């Protein structure tokens, strides 16, 4: 069993006799949470792919050209291949070859990077400016904060390190305005709050670079 198949067993709602496309079930995740909870975060272009006969449906291995690494320097400083389940019903990811640059997040198992539908993966040209800035420095600053999902009212923060995430029931839906334009960052006084702005909240501790 590959690492991703094991994860699907925990997250999905399927049985061995039911391999429908609805088997892959993922909880919504703010891009900052996806960043902080990933071993690897990179921008890359897919330049090739190969199907390996592993597991019930195989494993798809994508060859990539890494453009930039945002997280994972000590885990795997240079990524050449990413692994995913070949079947979308097992949360396998389908990527275009020689077409787009992608923002890819994933985990490292046995020296290999794995990703899937439950990871934050997006075409680079579809990321907002705030999301690109978040990848460079803002998300990292907020990894000690907690983004608390709110699915229905009333909901409240219960500690000073929480930001209330309300995209799921807002008019914008998911991914919504907070996902696209805000980062949850610790401010003066030790409280975490949503931040959006062209300048970093504290220039003395941030190495601000353009996306």
Swiss-Prot record:
<feature type="binding site">
    <location>
        <position position="24"/>
    </location>
    <ligand>
        <name>Zn(2+)</name>
    </ligand>
</feature>
<keyword id="KW-0483">Metalloprotease inhibitor</keyword>
<dbReference type="Pfam" id="PF00965">
    <property type="entry name" value="TIMP"/>
</dbReference>
<keyword id="KW-1015">Disulfide bond</keyword>
<keyword id="KW-0479">Metal-binding</keyword>
<keyword id="KW-0646">Protease inhibitor</keyword>
<feature type="region of interest" description="Involved in metalloproteinase-binding">
    <location>
        <begin position="24"/>
        <end position="27"/>
    </location>
</feature>
<dbReference type="InterPro" id="IPR001134">
    <property type="entry name" value="Netrin_domain"/>
</dbReference>
<feature type="disulfide bond">
    <location>
        <begin position="26"/>
        <end position="118"/>
    </location>
</feature>
<dbReference type="InterPro" id="IPR030490">
    <property type="entry name" value="TIMP_CS"/>
</dbReference>
<keyword id="KW-0862">Zinc</keyword>
<dbReference type="GO" id="GO:0031012">
    <property type="term" value="C:extracellular matrix"/>
</dbReference>
<dbReference type="GO" id="GO:0008270">
    <property type="term" value="F:zinc ion binding"/>
</dbReference>
<keyword id="KW-0325">Glycoprotein</keyword>
<keyword id="KW-0964">Secreted</keyword>
<feature type="disulfide bond">
    <location>
        <begin position="150"/>
        <end position="155"/>
    </location>
</feature>
<dbReference type="InterPro" id="IPR008993">
    <property type="entry name" value="TIMP-like_OB-fold"/>
</dbReference>
<dbReference type="GO" id="GO:0051045">
    <property type="term" value="P:negative regulation of membrane protein ectodomain proteolysis"/>
</dbReference>
<feature type="disulfide bond">
    <location>
        <begin position="24"/>
        <end position="91"/>
    </location>
</feature>
<dbReference type="GO" id="GO:0005615">
    <property type="term" value="C:extracellular space"/>
</dbReference>
<comment type="subunit">
    <text>Interacts with EFEMP1. Interacts with KDR.</text>
</comment>
<feature type="region of interest" description="Mediates interaction with EFEMP1">
    <location>
        <begin position="105"/>
        <end position="188"/>
    </location>
</feature>
<feature type="signal peptide">
    <location>
        <begin position="1"/>
        <end position="23"/>
    </location>
</feature>
<comment type="similarity">
    <text>Belongs to the protease inhibitor I35 (TIMP) family.</text>
</comment>
<feature type="region of interest" description="Involved in metalloproteinase-binding">
    <location>
        <begin position="88"/>
        <end position="89"/>
    </location>
</feature>
<feature type="disulfide bond">
    <location>
        <begin position="145"/>
        <end position="192"/>
    </location>
</feature>
<feature type="disulfide bond">
    <location>
        <begin position="163"/>
        <end position="184"/>
    </location>
</feature>
<dbReference type="GO" id="GO:0008191">
    <property type="term" value="F:metalloendopeptidase inhibitor activity"/>
</dbReference>
<feature type="disulfide bond">
    <location>
        <begin position="36"/>
        <end position="143"/>
    </location>
</feature>
<feature type="glycosylation site" description="N-linked (GlcNAc...) asparagine">
    <location>
        <position position="207"/>
    </location>
</feature>
<feature type="domain" description="NTR">
    <location>
        <begin position="24"/>
        <end position="143"/>
    </location>
</feature>
<keyword id="KW-0272">Extracellular matrix</keyword>
<keyword id="KW-0481">Metalloenzyme inhibitor</keyword>
<feature type="site" description="Involved in metalloproteinase-binding">
    <location>
        <position position="37"/>
    </location>
</feature>
<keyword id="KW-0732">Signal</keyword>
<dbReference type="GO" id="GO:0034097">
    <property type="term" value="P:response to cytokine"/>
</dbReference>
<comment type="function">
    <text>Mediates a variety of processes including matrix regulation and turnover, inflammation, and angiogenesis, through reversible inhibition of zinc protease superfamily enzymes, primarily matrix metalloproteinases (MMPs). Regulates extracellular matrix (ECM) remodeling through inhibition of matrix metalloproteinases (MMP) including MMP-1, MMP-2, MMP-3, MMP-7, MMP-9, MMP-13, MMP-14 and MMP-15. Additionally, modulates the processing of amyloid precursor protein (APP) and apolipoprotein E receptor ApoER2 by inhibiting two alpha-secretases ADAM10 and ADAM17.</text>
</comment>
<dbReference type="GO" id="GO:0009725">
    <property type="term" value="P:response to hormone"/>
</dbReference>
<protein>
    <recommendedName>
        <fullName>Metalloproteinase inhibitor 3</fullName>
    </recommendedName>
</protein>
<dbReference type="InterPro" id="IPR001820">
    <property type="entry name" value="TIMP"/>
</dbReference>
<dbReference type="InterPro" id="IPR027465">
    <property type="entry name" value="TIMP_C"/>
</dbReference>
């Amino acid at each position: 069993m590959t690492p991703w198949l094991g994860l699907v067993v925990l997250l999905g709602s399927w049985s061995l006799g039911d391999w429908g496309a609805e088997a892959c079930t993922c909880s919504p995740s703010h891009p900052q949470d996806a960043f902080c909870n990933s071993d690897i975060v990179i921008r890359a272009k897919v330049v090739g792919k190969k199907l390996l006969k592993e597991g019930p449906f195989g494993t798809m291995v994508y060859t990539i050209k890494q453009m930039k690494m945002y997280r994972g320097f000590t885990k795997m400083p240079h990524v050449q291949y990413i692994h995913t389940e070949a079947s979308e019903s097992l949360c396998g990811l389908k990527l275009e070859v020689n077409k787009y640059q992608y923002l890819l997040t994933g985990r490292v198992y046995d020296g290999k990077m794995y990703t899937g539908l439950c990871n934050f993966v997006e075409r680079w040209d579809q990321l907002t400016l705030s999301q690109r800035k978040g990848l460079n420095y803002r998300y990292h600053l907020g990894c000690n904060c907690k983004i608390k999902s709110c699915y229905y009212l009333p909901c409240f923060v219960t500690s000073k390190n929480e930001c209330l995430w309300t995209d799921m029931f807002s008019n914008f839906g998911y991914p919504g305005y907070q996902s696209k334009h805000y980062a949850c960052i610790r401010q003066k006084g030790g409280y975490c709050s949503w931040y959006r702005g062209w300048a970093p909240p504290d220039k003395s501790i941030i190495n601000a670079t353009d996306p």
